[in-house]
Protein backbone atom coordinates (compact mmCIF):
# COMPACT_ATOMS: atom_id res chain seq x y z
CA UNK A 1 0.00 0.00 0.00
CA UNK A 2 1.25 3.48 -0.85
CA UNK A 3 -0.12 6.79 0.36
CA UNK A 4 -0.09 9.02 -2.71
CA UNK A 5 -1.10 12.41 -1.32
CA UNK A 6 -2.68 14.66 1.29
CA UNK A 7 -4.83 17.41 -0.16
CA UNK A 8 -5.52 20.54 1.88
CA UNK A 9 -8.47 21.90 -0.11
CA UNK A 10 -8.61 25.11 1.95
CA UNK A 11 -5.63 26.40 -0.03
CA UNK A 12 -7.95 26.77 -3.05
CA UNK A 13 -10.40 29.02 -1.18
CA UNK A 14 -10.87 32.69 -1.97
CA UNK A 15 -13.43 35.33 -1.01
CA UNK A 16 -16.02 34.20 -3.57
CA UNK A 17 -15.33 30.45 -3.73
CA UNK A 18 -14.84 27.98 -0.91
CA UNK A 19 -14.22 24.26 -1.25
CA UNK A 20 -15.50 21.78 1.26
CA UNK A 21 -16.34 18.12 1.85
CA UNK A 22 -19.55 16.88 3.38
CA UNK A 23 -21.69 13.82 3.89
CA UNK A 24 -24.08 13.11 1.02
CA UNK A 25 -27.02 12.57 3.37
CA UNK A 26 -26.55 16.08 4.79
CA UNK A 27 -26.74 17.57 1.30
CA UNK A 28 -29.97 15.67 0.64
CA UNK A 29 -31.40 16.92 3.95
CA UNK A 30 -30.52 20.49 2.94
CA UNK A 31 -32.34 20.15 -0.39
CA UNK A 32 -35.41 18.53 1.15
CA UNK A 33 -35.70 21.33 3.72
CA UNK A 34 -35.52 23.99 1.01
CA UNK A 35 -37.86 22.45 -1.58
CA UNK A 36 -41.60 22.87 -0.86
CA UNK A 37 -43.02 19.47 0.10
CA UNK A 38 -45.93 19.83 -2.34
CA UNK A 39 -43.43 19.83 -5.22
CA UNK A 40 -42.04 16.37 -4.34
CA UNK A 41 -43.97 13.17 -5.07
CA UNK A 42 -42.42 10.11 -3.46
CA UNK A 43 -42.85 6.47 -4.56
CA UNK A 44 -43.86 7.42 -8.11
CA UNK A 45 -43.23 4.39 -10.33
CA UNK A 46 -42.88 5.47 -13.97
CA UNK A 47 -43.96 2.82 -16.52
CA UNK A 48 -44.28 4.59 -19.89
CA UNK A 49 -43.39 7.76 -21.81
CA UNK A 50 -45.25 9.09 -24.86
CA UNK A 51 -44.55 12.21 -26.86
CA UNK A 52 -47.63 13.82 -28.38
CA UNK A 53 -48.47 17.52 -28.21
CA UNK A 54 -46.80 17.31 -24.80
CA UNK A 55 -44.76 14.60 -23.08
CA UNK A 56 -47.09 12.18 -21.31
CA UNK A 57 -45.88 10.11 -18.36
CA UNK A 58 -47.80 7.08 -17.10
CA UNK A 59 -47.34 5.74 -13.58
CA UNK A 60 -47.95 2.41 -11.86
CA UNK A 61 -50.96 3.80 -9.96
CA UNK A 62 -52.65 4.42 -13.37
CA UNK A 63 -52.23 8.18 -13.09
CA UNK A 64 -50.75 10.18 -15.96
CA UNK A 65 -49.26 13.66 -16.25
CA UNK A 66 -48.30 15.90 -19.19
CA UNK A 67 -45.20 18.08 -19.34
CA UNK A 68 -43.38 20.38 -21.76
CA UNK A 69 -39.97 19.13 -20.60
CA UNK A 70 -38.68 16.07 -18.78
CA UNK A 71 -35.39 16.19 -16.87
CA UNK A 72 -34.44 12.69 -15.73
CA UNK A 73 -31.92 12.45 -12.90
CA UNK A 74 -32.90 9.01 -11.62
CA UNK A 75 -29.44 7.52 -11.24
CA UNK A 76 -27.36 4.67 -12.61
CA UNK A 77 -30.35 2.34 -13.06
CA UNK A 78 -32.47 5.10 -14.58
CA UNK A 79 -36.06 3.91 -15.09
CA UNK A 80 -36.49 6.70 -17.63
CA UNK A 81 -33.53 5.44 -19.64
CA UNK A 82 -34.74 1.83 -19.52
CA UNK A 83 -38.16 2.86 -20.85
CA UNK A 84 -36.57 4.86 -23.68
CA UNK A 85 -33.85 2.37 -24.66
CA UNK A 86 -35.08 -0.98 -23.25
CA UNK A 87 -32.17 -3.33 -22.35
CA UNK A 88 -29.69 -1.02 -24.05
CA UNK A 89 -30.40 1.46 -21.27
CA UNK A 90 -28.99 -0.88 -18.61
CA UNK A 91 -25.45 -0.27 -17.27
CA UNK A 92 -22.75 -2.94 -17.05
CA UNK A 93 -20.87 -4.26 -14.02
CA UNK A 94 -17.41 -2.67 -13.76
CA UNK A 95 -15.74 -5.66 -12.06
CA UNK A 96 -15.35 -3.52 -8.96
CA UNK A 97 -17.00 -3.09 -5.58
CA UNK A 98 -17.23 0.04 -3.44
CA UNK A 99 -17.01 0.08 0.35
CA UNK A 100 -18.25 3.11 2.25
CA UNK A 101 -18.02 3.72 5.97
CA UNK A 102 -17.18 6.21 8.71
CA UNK A 103 -13.97 6.71 10.69
CA UNK A 104 -13.68 8.72 13.90
CA UNK A 105 -10.62 10.64 15.11
CA UNK A 106 -8.43 10.02 12.07
CA UNK A 107 -4.98 11.56 12.51
CA UNK A 108 -5.04 13.63 9.30
CA UNK A 109 -7.60 16.40 8.70
CA UNK A 110 -6.90 16.64 4.96
CA UNK A 111 -8.05 14.39 2.10
CA UNK A 112 -5.88 11.26 2.07
CA UNK A 113 -5.57 8.93 -0.94
CA UNK A 114 -4.05 5.45 -0.59
CA UNK A 115 -3.16 3.14 -3.47
CA UNK A 116 -2.70 -0.63 -3.38
CA UNK A 117 -2.72 -3.60 -5.75
CA UNK A 118 -6.25 -3.88 -7.17
CA UNK A 119 -7.73 -1.38 -4.72
CA UNK A 120 -7.54 2.20 -3.52
CA UNK A 121 -9.25 4.14 -0.77
CA UNK A 122 -9.87 7.74 0.22
CA UNK A 123 -10.38 9.21 3.70
CA UNK A 124 -11.73 12.75 4.04
CA UNK A 125 -13.41 14.88 6.75
CA UNK A 126 -17.17 15.42 6.60
CA UNK A 127 -17.68 17.76 9.58
CA UNK A 128 -15.92 19.53 12.45
CA UNK A 129 -16.54 16.63 14.86
CA UNK A 130 -13.56 14.59 13.68
CA UNK A 131 -15.74 12.30 11.57
CA UNK A 132 -14.37 11.08 8.25
CA UNK A 133 -15.76 9.26 5.25
CA UNK A 134 -13.96 6.12 4.14
CA UNK A 135 -14.48 5.04 0.53
CA UNK A 136 -12.64 2.17 -1.14
CA UNK A 137 -12.82 0.74 -4.66
CA UNK A 138 -11.78 -2.92 -4.95
CA UNK A 139 -11.44 -4.93 -8.15
CA UNK A 140 -13.74 -7.92 -7.85
CA UNK A 141 -15.09 -10.17 -10.57
CA UNK A 142 -18.45 -11.72 -9.82
CA UNK A 143 -20.27 -14.54 -11.56
CA UNK A 144 -23.88 -14.09 -12.69
CA UNK A 145 -25.22 -15.96 -9.67
CA UNK A 146 -23.39 -13.61 -7.30
CA UNK A 147 -24.58 -10.54 -9.20
CA UNK A 148 -28.21 -11.60 -8.90
CA UNK A 149 -27.86 -12.26 -5.16
CA UNK A 150 -28.65 -8.85 -3.69
CA UNK A 151 -28.18 -10.20 -0.15
CA UNK A 152 -24.50 -10.80 -0.91
CA UNK A 153 -23.70 -7.11 -0.54
CA UNK A 154 -25.26 -7.03 2.93
CA UNK A 155 -23.47 -10.18 4.07
CA UNK A 156 -21.10 -9.40 6.96
CA UNK A 157 -18.67 -12.18 6.03
CA UNK A 158 -18.41 -10.93 2.45
CA UNK A 159 -17.80 -7.35 3.63
CA UNK A 160 -15.24 -8.46 6.25
CA UNK A 161 -13.33 -10.42 3.61
CA UNK A 162 -13.11 -7.30 1.46
CA UNK A 163 -11.90 -5.23 4.42
CA UNK A 164 -9.33 -7.90 5.26
CA UNK A 165 -8.12 -7.82 1.66
CA UNK A 166 -7.26 -4.14 2.14
CA UNK A 167 -6.04 -4.40 5.74
CA UNK A 168 -3.59 -7.20 4.90
CA UNK A 169 -1.78 -4.80 2.56
CA UNK A 170 -2.16 -1.70 4.70
CA UNK A 171 -0.75 -0.31 7.92
CA UNK A 172 -4.33 0.40 9.05
CA UNK A 173 -6.44 -2.06 10.99
CA UNK A 174 -9.58 -1.13 9.10
CA UNK A 175 -11.72 -3.70 10.90
CA UNK A 176 -11.40 -1.68 14.09
CA UNK A 177 -11.46 1.80 12.52
CA UNK A 178 -14.29 1.72 9.96
CA UNK A 179 -17.88 1.91 11.25
CA UNK A 180 -21.26 1.62 9.53
CA UNK A 181 -19.64 -0.12 6.57
CA UNK A 182 -21.74 -0.63 3.44
CA UNK A 183 -20.97 -2.45 0.20
CA UNK A 184 -22.06 -1.66 -3.38
CA UNK A 185 -21.34 -3.21 -6.79
CA UNK A 186 -20.18 -0.59 -9.30
CA UNK A 187 -21.96 -0.19 -12.61
CA UNK A 188 -21.00 2.08 -15.52
CA UNK A 189 -22.67 3.14 -18.74
CA UNK A 190 -22.06 1.14 -21.91
CA UNK A 191 -22.30 4.08 -24.31
CA UNK A 192 -23.86 7.49 -24.88
CA UNK A 193 -27.59 7.39 -25.55
CA UNK A 194 -29.58 10.43 -26.66
CA UNK A 195 -33.40 10.31 -26.54
CA UNK A 196 -35.10 10.72 -29.92
CA UNK A 197 -38.10 12.25 -28.20
CA UNK A 198 -37.80 16.03 -28.08
CA UNK A 199 -37.42 17.89 -24.80
CA UNK A 200 -36.32 14.88 -22.75
CA UNK A 201 -33.03 15.48 -20.96
CA UNK A 202 -30.96 12.89 -19.11
CA UNK A 203 -28.56 14.25 -16.52
CA UNK A 204 -26.15 12.97 -13.87
CA UNK A 205 -25.68 9.19 -13.72
CA UNK A 206 -28.87 8.75 -15.72
CA UNK A 207 -27.04 10.29 -18.68
CA UNK A 208 -23.68 8.59 -18.12
CA UNK A 209 -22.24 6.71 -15.16
CA UNK A 210 -18.44 6.91 -14.80
CA UNK A 211 -15.89 4.63 -13.15
CA UNK A 212 -15.63 6.17 -9.64
CA UNK A 213 -11.95 7.14 -9.69
CA UNK A 214 -12.04 10.87 -10.37
CA UNK A 215 -14.42 12.12 -7.65
CA UNK A 216 -16.53 13.44 -10.51
CA UNK A 217 -20.06 12.19 -9.84
CA UNK A 218 -21.55 15.09 -7.87
CA UNK A 219 -19.55 17.81 -9.63
CA UNK A 220 -20.61 16.58 -13.07
CA UNK A 221 -24.26 16.39 -12.00
CA UNK A 222 -24.12 20.00 -10.80
CA UNK A 223 -22.29 21.12 -13.94
CA UNK A 224 -24.80 19.30 -16.18
CA UNK A 225 -27.72 20.93 -14.36
CA UNK A 226 -26.17 24.35 -14.96
CA UNK A 227 -25.57 23.54 -18.65
CA UNK A 228 -29.17 22.45 -19.07
CA UNK A 229 -30.51 25.55 -17.30
CA UNK A 230 -28.50 27.80 -19.62
CA UNK A 231 -29.60 25.78 -22.64
CA UNK A 232 -33.29 26.15 -21.79
CA UNK A 233 -32.96 29.78 -20.76
CA UNK A 234 -31.28 30.70 -24.06
CA UNK A 235 -33.57 28.45 -26.12
CA UNK A 236 -30.56 26.66 -27.62
CA UNK A 237 -29.98 22.96 -28.30
CA UNK A 238 -26.36 22.41 -27.31
CA UNK A 239 -26.91 20.46 -24.09
CA UNK A 240 -26.14 16.95 -25.34
CA UNK A 241 -23.33 18.14 -27.61
CA UNK A 242 -21.57 19.84 -24.68
CA UNK A 243 -22.26 16.97 -22.28
CA UNK A 244 -20.85 14.32 -24.61
CA UNK A 245 -17.67 16.32 -25.18
CA UNK A 246 -17.10 16.92 -21.46
CA UNK A 247 -18.14 13.40 -20.47
CA UNK A 248 -15.65 11.83 -22.88
CA UNK A 249 -12.85 13.86 -21.25
CA UNK A 250 -13.90 12.92 -17.71
CA UNK A 251 -14.49 9.27 -18.59
CA UNK A 252 -11.03 8.84 -20.13
CA UNK A 253 -9.37 10.41 -17.07
CA UNK A 254 -11.43 8.35 -14.65
CA UNK A 255 -10.67 5.10 -16.50
CA UNK A 256 -6.95 5.96 -16.55
CA UNK A 257 -7.03 6.78 -12.83
CA UNK A 258 -8.73 3.48 -12.05
CA UNK A 259 -6.00 1.61 -13.93
CA UNK A 260 -3.13 3.61 -12.41
CA UNK A 261 -4.49 3.49 -8.84
CA UNK A 262 -4.63 -0.31 -8.86
CA UNK A 263 -1.23 -1.07 -10.39
CA UNK A 264 0.92 -3.59 -8.53
CA UNK A 265 4.51 -2.50 -7.94
CA UNK A 266 6.88 -5.41 -7.29
Could you describe each region identified by the protein language model?
Residues 1-85, 89-102, 143-145, 155-156:
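Conserved N-terminal helical subregion
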Residues 6, 13-19, 23-24, 28, ...:
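Conserved FAD/dinucleotide-binding core of flavoprotein oxidoreductases
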Residues 43-45, 60, 116, 137, ...:
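Conserved beta-strand termini and adjacent loop/short-helix elements that scaffold enzyme active sites
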Residues 66, 131, 198-199:
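Conserved catalytic motifs of the protein kinase core domain
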Residues 77-78, 98-100, 119-122, 207-208:
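Histidine-centered metal-chelating micro-motifs
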Residues 168-175, 193, 213-220, 226-266:
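C-terminal helical "tail/cap" subdomain of flavin- and related membrane-associated enzymes
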Residues 184-211:
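FAD-binding beta-loop-beta segment adjacent to the flavin cofactor pocket
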